[in-house]
Structures are given as C-alpha cells and as structure tokens.
Amino acid sequence: MATFKTLSSADIKTTRSNLNQLIDFVEEDVSGSATRKKIKVFVTGAADAGGNIGSVTSSIYQTVYDQDFTLQTSNELFDLTYGVFKNSNTVTSCSSGTDINGKLLFPSESLMMREKVNVYNQMAQGLLGTNDEQFASPFGSTTNENKIDNALFINLKRLFVRDGIKRETFAMRMYRSASAAEKAEDSALTTDGQTNIFRETTSGSIIITDVGAASSIERSNFGGDVGNLVNSANTSENLGLIFYQKGIVVLDIEKICSGTQLMSGTIGAVGNTTSTTPTRANLIPDFVVSASMDDVVDHFASTRFGKGTQTFLTFQNNTMINSTLVFCRATADEFNFSSNPTYTDADGRIVCIDENSQGIQKSFSFVTTVGLYDANEQLLAVS
C-alpha cells in the first residue's frame, strides 16, 4: 500500500540559474558561396533600346550556414541583409518622389531601393516599435551624426543565441575597406580600375565589440536589452548596436566602412542582357543604390570578414534554467511499511523486524519509489 504525505510550501523551492556557452563563427562560413543560401524572391525585367530583355533576380537576405547548406547536417548561423532609412540622404538623393499612395519612386538606374527601405522599416518596427524611428549609436541618441542611415543587419539564429547574448562577450573582426581599385589608393596596382567588389582585402581590420555595455544598460520596450558596439581600439567610436535578447546586430556601414572608397566591378542591372554592367563609383551612395540586395550582401560577405579558418565573430550565449525542487522528507518512523509481498509472512505478520538498543522491536522498510500527486491524487511524476 502507498503512504501519502501532504507537501507544504516549505517543501517546494524554485531556483533559476544561467548557463553560458561560447560561440564562434569562422571566416570561411560567411565568405563561401556554398555556405550562403539565397532565396530568390525579387525579379525584374526591362527592354533596352534594341528590344532585348534583361532581368535581375535577387533575394532579400542571405542565410549563412556552418557548412554546405545542401547537406542535412548543416546548421543556420545567421541571416545577413542590408537596409536604408527612408529619410536618409541615400534615399532622398536618388528618389524621384512618391506616387498618390505614398510609395517611393526611383529611376531605373537604382535597384531594389523600396526593398532596402522596407528591410530597414521592418527592423525598426520590431526593435524600436515603429518604422518611423531611426537606429542610432549610441542607442537613443538624437544627434544627426549618430543616426544610422545605411545599416548592415546580422540576425543570429536562436540555436546559438538561446535566451540571449551575455553582455560584454560580443566581438567581431571586420575590414573597413575593400581591395584597392585605383593606383592612387595602392601604388602596387599596375592599372586603374581593378575590380574590387568581390575581391577580398587582407589589411585594415578592426574589432567591433560591446565593451562597456554592462556599465551602461540600455533597454528598448520592444527589442529588449541593447548594447552599443564600439571600436575596441577607440571605444569612443560608436559603430552600431546589439540587441541581446533578439540576437540582432545593427552596424552603421558609413562608420564600419570607408563610404567614399571607389568600387569597381560588375553588378546586375535592369535591361542588360548579360545581367551585368560595369560600375566604378563610391561605396555610398553609388554602389548600395545601384546594386541589388544580393550584390550588396555578396560584397560584404565575401570581402569584409576574411576567407580563412580564423574566428571572425564570437560571443557567449545565455540559457536560463528554471528548476522546481520538491523535497520529500521522511522523518523517523515515517513510511515504515511496504506493499512488497516479502514484507509479511503467509499469516500476514510483518517479518522485517529489528530490535533496537532498548529491546523494542520495530518494523523497517526502504523507500524505493516516490510519487508526486496533485490534489485529486493523480500521479504527476515518479522518482
């Protein structure tokens, strides 16, 4: 037979503990084309003067995997995309106005500008609460020079973020400039106009970190805890934001990169039958306006993070473990009976008898199973 004992509040204890795990991503994960998955959701077509049709297809974001994404064992690491604020100089300088419904209009020389604006709006809506709000670093700054017009978004996957990123553990290495395109930039070049859109660079790297975030706690009502990302060599230089619970990094492209650097190479263009057209202009605004989302992301992924086996991004995640401990206390002489058939003889008399020091014989038993029941005596758990 079972013996029941009612539990009191003193027998139940709830605890919360944190488990931290070190995460790091290597350069070749983000730079390799086989580890970046593109889902083509945008396509456009136009006729040139000769009536030939050319089109550009592109994704809105790219997902980076830890190995070839076609393998079943591959894991999603993060999403990478680009967005631009709707009232920024990048947009207003190339927009031809709006239609009667308020939709932004752009000339054919630009590509996917509405999609780039929509990405920024979506991120602002989810992290700041409204798509009219603009990201700024330091967080909440109202100074124009701290506003983020052109943003590179890194959306880390929940598999690695878990319940959030631990403050002051985030660090990322990035190259501020692409390979040189002109002899004026690099005297080693034999000719001007070398293509550098998708050519890696090996110098000029910086470490972007959230050092100091623990002493300056910022919070968004919609995005959770926020940290300011700075240059590790000059912590007064703000480069972006990190939303710890969301696992989203927002980088100010105009500060992490040289926006005036000349870009040379080929990008997709509307009405071009070869799907490419040469470009040789500044990174901002020319390249980010003229290139598709895939071309912009391909440039950053293939040239700005390196291509080796070294770590380019690392952080510690935080897993919250909620535990409820139920103490089943058995005091002296409690539960001294067993339903095991060997506990009694054929006549029903208890055979498990032990004589104590006073010569008093008492029965004894060993607890083998403990059941946890609710108020209706329904079994909930067994130990």
Question: What is each of the regions a protein language model found here?
Answer:
Residues M1-S383:
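Long, position-biased, composition-driven segments near the start of the mature protein
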